[in-house]
């Protein structure tokens, strides 16, 4: 992609003015796309526990105005995708997500919000996942203007055997501040909204 961008800039410089604009527009669009991909990568994580793959991605969605002397809050949405990568016939072939636990830290690494491990379900449900099944949900949390990070665990019950339950890790992912707000102060108290 970098070579494509460079080629379009070079071609735009050598082209007639009428032909240069589309080439330069394409190069700039590719650069914006790369920046967006880099930001998404920085706010994503993936972890696999006993064949359960948990992918997480977050995005800043809003800055809330302070209310009655309280500091302003910023809200992030996050997407969690849980995939059962266990093959048919394996001991962990049929699974159910039964609980969750979250730790949200501010940009300095201080605890900001917590959902205790064992809190029932995810977004009001306890999905069952057969082999190759996937369940995806969206939720939100708040944090100060500087952002922070989030990590946790999903309690998973094995349905087909005496496998009991285990915790599937949700690897730490960033709550990145919006570019216009980066470097500004912020604080606030908040909670994960599930």
Language-model features: locations:
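Intrinsically disordered, low-complexity Pro/Gly/Ser/Thr-rich segments with frequent PxxP/GP/PP motifs
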Residues: 109-147
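Short acidic, flexible loop segments centered on an aromatic residue
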Residues: 88-112
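Terminal connector regions
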Residues: 140-194
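Long, contiguous binding/interaction regions
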Residues: 1, 22, 29, 60, ...
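Short, solvent-exposed loop/turn segments enriched in Ser/Thr/Gly
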Residues: 73-79, 150-151
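Residue-level recognition of well-ordered beta-strand positions that form the cores
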Residues: 57, 79-83, 103, 140, ...
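Short, solvent-exposed beta-strand/turn "edge" segments of beta-rich domains on protein surfaces
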Residues: 58-76, 88-93, 126-131, 142-145
């Amino acid at each position: 992609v970098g070579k494509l961008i460079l080629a379009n800039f070079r071609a735009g410089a050598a082209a007639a003015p009428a032909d240069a604009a589309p080439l330069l527009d394409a190069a700039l669009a590719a650069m914006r796309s790369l920046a967006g991909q880099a930001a998404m990568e920085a706010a994503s994580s993936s972890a696999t526990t006993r064949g359960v793959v948990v992918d997480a991605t977050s995005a800043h969605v809003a800055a809330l105005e302070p209310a009655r002397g309280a500091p302003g809050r910023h809200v992030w949405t996050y997407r969690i995708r849980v995939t059962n990568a266990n093959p048919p016939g394996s001991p962990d072939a049929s699974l159910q997500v039964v609980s969750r636990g979250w730790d949200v830290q501010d940009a300095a690494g201080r605890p900001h919000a917590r959902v205790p491990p064992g809190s029932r379900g995810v977004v009001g449900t306890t999905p069952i996942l057969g082999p190759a099944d996937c369940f995806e949900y969206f939720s939100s949390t708040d944090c100060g203007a500087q952002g922070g990070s989030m990590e946790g665990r999903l309690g998973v019950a094995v349905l087909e055997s005496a496998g009991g339950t285990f915790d599937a890790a949700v690897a730490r992912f960033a709550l990145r501040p919006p570019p216009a707000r980066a470097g500004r102060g912020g604080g606030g108290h908040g909670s994960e909204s599930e």
